[in-house]
């Protein structure tokens, strides 16, 4: 498992944690209760996806004013907000990871980071555009 230090700064508050960096997840997922607590800005777009467990998940797209990943600050990051199932939260907790945030590939790419599974961390890389 790859871990990353994150800090979400919303309109009304912020939240710091060590989260799972999941390259199998397209978007960063934020639990609804945390999104409400820090006050994210909803875009009005509904999202549907299938979780790793095979269950359908309904989410809302939102924008976090600032999402910091391993010290790299990303302004106005789009995230998926949903109720993370308790079974998933339990697995994350048992792995020593935060249960409210799962980093997705789009966030990692925007931060110019790749997953280093051998080290269990993220690594900065040079960004380039083709």
Model-derived features with residue positions:
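Pepsin/retropepsin-fold aspartyl endopeptidases
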Residues: 1-130
């Amino acid at each position: 498992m790859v871990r990353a230090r994150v800090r979400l700064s919303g309109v009304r508050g912020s939240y710091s944690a060590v989260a799972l960096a999941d390259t199998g997840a397209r978007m960063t997922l934020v639990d609804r209760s945390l999104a409400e607590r820090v006050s994210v800005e909803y875009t009005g777009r509904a999202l549907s996806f299938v979780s790793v467990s095979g269950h359908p998940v309904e989410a809302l797209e939102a924008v976090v004013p600032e999402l910091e990943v391993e010290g790299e600050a990303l302004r106005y990051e789009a995230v998926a907000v949903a109720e993370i199932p308790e079974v998933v939260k339990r697995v994350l907790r048992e792995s020593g990871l935060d249960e409210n945030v799962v980093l997705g590939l789009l966030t990692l790419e925007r931060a110019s980071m790749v997953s280093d599974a051998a080290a269990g961390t993220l690594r900065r890389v040079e960004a380039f555009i083709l």
